[in-house]
């Protein structure tokens, strides 16, 4: 009988590559902003953060001090109105609001988006299950 000198690792490497492909295709890669905003949390599992859009998305953020940000750049509400009016109607908008921000500012932005007929609005929230205690 012939003695086996070394273990064949090719099947192990094949399995690991398949697992790597599965993990990379199912993972949700959403880049969050670098702004100091504390995102509200929800209990639901059905958040649509996995729907990463193919088109160029625009991020509008509201800080807890009432400042507005358009794609990570601070902007006045009047300039925000102008920028939003130039967007295409099918542009996806990601709205980030600090959980301590004024609700009035949030409603102003939503009203501005509705006035400009921008329907693809995504509100960024954090799942409570993912929070570390």
Swiss-Prot record:
One of its GO terms (cellular component) is plasma membrane. GO terms for biological process: protein transport. It comes from the Bacteria. Keywords: Cell inner membrane, Cell membrane, Membrane, Protein transport, Transmembrane, Transmembrane helix, Transport. InterPro entries: ExbD. Residues 1-9 are cytoplasmic. It is a single-pass type II membrane protein. It is found in: Cell inner membrane. One of its GO terms (molecular function) is transmembrane transporter activity. Residues 31-133 are periplasmic. The chain crosses the membrane at residues 10-30. The keyword Ribonucleoprotein does not apply. PANTHER family: BIOPOLYMER TRANSPORT PROTEIN EXBD, EXBD MEMBRANE COMPONENT OF PMF-DRIVEN MACROMOLECULE IMPORT SYSTEM. Belongs to the ExbD/TolR family. This is Putative biopolymer transport protein ExbD-like 2. It comes from Helicobacter pylori (strain ATCC 700392 / 26695).
